[in-house]
Structures are given as C-alpha cells and as structure tokens.
Design a protein with these regions (language model features):
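Start-transfer (signal-anchor) and selected internal transmembrane alpha helices
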Residues: 1-23, 50-129, 554-559
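Membrane-interface anchor segments at the N-terminal boundary of transmembrane helices
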Residues: 53, 188-189, 427-518, 522
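Extracytoplasmic catalytic/substrate-binding loops of multi-pass membrane glycan-assembly enzymes
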Residues: 136-148, 156-172, 176, 180-181, ...
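Transmembrane-helix motifs of polytopic, lipid-linked glycan transferases
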Residues: 192-213
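Membrane-interface alpha helices of multi-pass inner-membrane proteins
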Residues: 272-287, 298-299, 318-323
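Membrane-proximal stem/loop segments at transmembrane-domain junctions that anchor or position
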Residues: 335-465
Length: 559
C-alpha cells in the first residue's frame, strides 16, 4: 500500500484523478443548480469565479476520496474470508450450560437449519416492512394509484400507466367492494401483496450473494441494509409500480451477471433463458422504459456472448414480440388507449420552455413552428424540476404532424442557446446525480382525490402506531433527515448514482471490462430515466435496491 501511495502504481493515481474530476464536477454543478438554478453565475471571489474554478478547487479533495476508496477495495479483495465465522457449530456443546437449556437451544437451531435459507430471508424481510405498514396503515396510497383505479372504473382504460399494475389494483378493489369491505382494506391487501413480492426479491438477492460466496461483511451488511434502511419499508407499502419494477430490475441484473460470468452453465439447456425471458418481460410490463432498458443491453451482450448468439437472439426477439403484442393487438382487444407520445419528449419540452422564459434567442419563424405545439402561455408554465405543467398542455397531434420540422427547430434554437439548454436538463435531472438535493422526499401520505366520485378509491391513513407514523413522516414528508449531515447523503438517491460511477471507474481501473456488462442494465435504466419528467426518489429506487450488487461487483475478483 505504501508503494501505491508513493506513486509506483501510476494507474491508480490516474484513475483517482479522473474520478476526482468527475465527482468534483457533479458536486459543484449540483451546488450551482441547487442554489442558483444555473451553472453560469459569475462570482466576485476569484477562486469561485466560474463553474470551472469551483470544480478545480474541489478536485484534490475528491481525488483523495477516490484513491482511498480504491485502496480500501483492493484491501477488501485481498482479505481471506472466513465464511464460518460467528456461526454455531453443530457439534459444539457448552460445558457450563445446563443440559436442558442446551438441548432446547440445539433443537431450535436444528429446526432453523431445516428451513430453506430463502424462506428465512423472506420472512425476515417481510417482518422488517411491518413498522412502515403499521405506521402508515393501510400504506402509502399515493402517486398514480388513485388515478389508475379511478380512470379505469370510470370507463377510461389507458396504457399511460402499466396495465399489469392497474389490473392488479383494480382486481383487488373490485373484489373487496363486492365483498362489502372498505377501500382501506383493499389498499392494505395491495400493500401486503407488494410486501410479499419485494421481500421475496430481497431474499433472492441475499441467497445469490451467499451462493456466490460473498464475504461475510457484505451479506450481513445486505441483511441490515434491507431491514433497517427506511426507504425499503416505505417503498414496500407504497402503491406505485416503481416498487416491484425496482425489484424486478435487480433480478434482471442478476440474470445478466449469471449469463456473463458462467455462460457455459447458464446457456446449457433452456431453463435459464426462459426464466430470463419471463423476468425481462415483467420489467417491460411494469414500466415502459423497462423494454428500452433491456433491449439497449442486447448489442453489448451479443458482442461478448457471441458464442451463444442464437439463444440471445431468441431472447431479444421474444422481448420485442411481447412488447409488440402488448402495445398492439392486446390493447385493441381490451379496448385500452395507448400512452401519449409526449412522455418521450420531456427534454424537448423543458429546454424550449426554459429558453422562452429566460428570454433566449427564439426567432419569429421558429415560434411559428413551436406555437401550434406549445404556445407562449403554455411555455410560461415552466417549472425547473418538473415537466408536467408544460407537458400536460403539449399538443401531441400537432407535434406528430410536423415532427421533423419541430425537432429541427428545437435543434436550431439549442445551437444558439446552449447554456440555457444545459441548465434546463440539469435542473430537471438534479436529484438523480446530486446527493445534497434539498427538496428530495418520499411523502408518507394517502391521497384521497375526487372525494365525491364513487369510481375513485377513498383511502384514509389510520396509523396503528403513532410513534412509527411520526418517525416515517419525519423521514418522508417532512424530510427532517435533510438537516443531518452524512445521514442526508445516505438517504439520497444521488449517493447511489455516485456509487454506480465509482463501481464503473474501479472496474476499468482493474481492467475488468467484461464486468461492466454486469451493471449495464443500471446505466441503461438511468439513461432512460434522465429523459423523464422529474427526478423523483421512486424513480431512483432501483439504484438503492441494487446497492449490495454494486458492492459485490467491485469486491468480486475476475477469474
């Protein structure tokens, strides 16, 4: 380690410096966007005059941080793990303990040993979700769930939200209403089902780490992380598609790791390929960008796994087929309306709107093209961190008629207003990549909208424990943790993006290039999320759920 610190290992210094520049840029750009709304503010202090001066000053600090992280990871890799440490021995007996107590203890231990590890983890994680469930009974009935149910029961079936998730919600509410039960009971059943699914996925992750002989510190840390990290319990009882989607995305990640690390075993027969197809299909059925996430990985997997290209192509074509059938014949059969294409153009919407509001250079002939799609009154609704106010007034039909001309105009305006476009993108995506965002939160509430409409669900929060309710409200709605340094960062989705960046840098430093494929789905998902309407914590939750896998990827030496 001393030799490395004195520069004999030039490679580690190069990558530490590279990482220092990257993280310093994230940190200072985030600070400027958070406090000033723009990167281009000029300071009277010569040390902070421009964004480039600010980044340069922070580079040494972050270079040291990356260097220490790399050295720590190298040390952890070099340690020999004692997988049996801390576990009871079957044959051991305490000479001082009473025989009856010892017999009972051994009997309990023997009974526990006979329970499959997966079931034990599953039960443990389910129990760990109960505090959030009891503190916010019947759960966080918020986000899109009220509209998903209200729209469907009103006769408007739309693929704007995933129909699989909408179908489950509506099925449970239909059943409970038919039985004369309350909407609170229906919401509770939805959340218990979600708790069971997420606990099972967490159990799968824990068993994967044990099977891959992860070090004891990692699998114990994983158990503690899944049980104690408050957002896991809150997301488990949050009736949003993002909860199960996040878990399924991590399962897809595990499939990619297995097919890349042991391809001979993985592609022997069709069992694993079929399971991967089911998992990938669930991903696209739970979120529209799930399809783009996995499809974007296929070319890279084909290059590395060319020997197994036939099965990979079958898998990819199957995914395309499921997506095509779902968005075509299936929607027609059930009479569902397709999702609005404007969801794909959030960056276009935000950049043009900010340019207009900021008084940027938009020429009259360009406004003639823009106005039928977004008029001046619409663009004046611009909100830096959320595209919905403008997007909801975006005229998709007019856009589709002149799509090429509109996008050409957008590009031309951007060429003259580069700084405004950059500011618009960074403001909308800030929460994804900056750990110190002040307004990041996960509301611990129930939404009861359209109170006079019988088609809509009417769910009221009835906490079974007031102190648990106060705790989770402080963590979520009030975001009180934002006042506590370090804790603030640990509970920020931006930190987990930084972990993803650190993992990528470390793998390149170690020349373990093929392992970049292991985390490729996370990068692809993040890429699609950056094009979304906002940086919400539930959108960044997949990175939090995948945290143990990122640590495993960095720890695991390439064979």
């Amino acid at each position: 380690m001393t030799d490395k610190l004195h520069g004999k290992n030039l490679r580690i210094w190069i990558f530490a410096l590279l990482g220092g520049i990257v993280f310093a840029a994230f940190d200072r750009c985030g600070y400027m966007i958070q406090h000033y709304g723009t990167l281009w503010a000029i300071s009277e202090n010569p040390l902070h005059k421009t964004i480039f001066h600010r980044i340069l000053i922070r580079v040494p600090l972050f270079t040291a941080g990356v260097l220490i992280s790399f050295l720590l990871l190298n040390w952890l890799r070099g340690r020999s793990t004692d997988s049996g440490a801390g576990l009871p021995k079957r044959g051991s007996q305490g000479s001082t303990a009473p025989q009856t107590a010892m017999a009972k203890s051994l009997a309990l231990y023997s009974a526990a040993q006979n329970i499959p590890a997966f079931i034990k983890y599953w039960i443990l994680y389910f129990i760990s979700f109960l505090p959030a469930f009891l503190g916010g009974y019947p759960g966080l009935f918020a986000a899109d769930a009220p509209n998903q149910i209200g729209w469907t029961f009103s006769g408007w079936l739309t693929a704007h939200h995933p129909l699989l998730h909408t179908g489950i919600l509506c099925g449970i509410f239909s059943m409970t209403r038919a039985l004369g039960w309350s909407d609170n009971t229906a919401a509770a059943l939805c959340n218990v089902l979600q708790m069971i699914i997420l606990a099972g996925i967490f159990a799968w992750i824990s068993c994967f780490l044990k099977k891959k002989q992860a070090p004891q510190w990692l699998w114990i840390g994983t158990v503690l992380f899944f049980c104690l990290f408050p957002f896991h319990g809150m997301m488990a009882v949050y009736t949003t598609k993002d909860t199960v989607f996040s878990g399924v995305l991590v399962l897809c990640l595990l499939q990619v790791i297995c097919m890349c690390s042991t391809p001979e075993e993985y592609f022997k027969g069709w069992r694993h390929t079929i399971f991967a197809g089911i998992t990938f299909s669930l991903l696209l059925l739970l979120r529209n960008n799930g399809f783009h996430t996995m499809l974007a990985c296929v070319p890279f997997l084909l290059i590395y796994l060319w020997k197994y290209r036939k099965k990979l192509l079958v898998l990819a074509l199957g995914l395309v087929l499921v997506y095509g059938v779902y968005n075509g014949p299936f929607l027609n059969v059930i009479g569902a309306e397709s999702g609005n294409a404007r969801e794909m153009y959030n960056i276009v919407i935000q950049t043009l709107s900010r340019t207009y509001v900021a008084g940027g250079d938009i020429r009259p002939e360009e406004m003639d093209v823009i106005r039928p799609v977004m008029d001046e009154e619409t663009m004046a609704l611009y909100t830096p961190n959320l595209s919905d106010p403008v997007k909801n007034q975006f005229h998709t039909d007019a856009f589709e008629e002149e799509k090429a001309e509109f996008l050409k105009t957008w590009f031309q305006v951007g060429c003259r207003n580069k700084k405004i476009y950059i500011d618009a993108f960074l403001n909308t995506t800030l929460g994804f990549w900056y750990p110190d965002v002040e307004d990041e939160y996960l509301e611990f509430v129930c939404f009861d909208i359209q109170k006079d409409d019988p088609h809509y669900p009417h769910v009221q929060m009835e906490p079974k424990s007031e102190w648990l309710n106060r705790y989770y409200t402080a963590i979520g709605t009030d975001a009180s943790f934002r006042q506590i340094p370090i804790v603030r960062e640990l509970l920020s989705m931006g930190l987990y993006f930084w972990l993803l960046v650190l993992a990528s840098l470390y793998l390149i430093y170690q020349k373990e290039y093929r392992k970049l494929l292991w985390i490729l789905p996370l990068w692809m998902y993040l890429g699609t999320s950056l094009l979304g309407p906002a940086a919400l914590l539930r959108y960044g939750y997949p990175l939090m759920a995948a945290c143990p896998i990122l640590l495993f990827t960095m720890w695991k030496k390439e064979a």
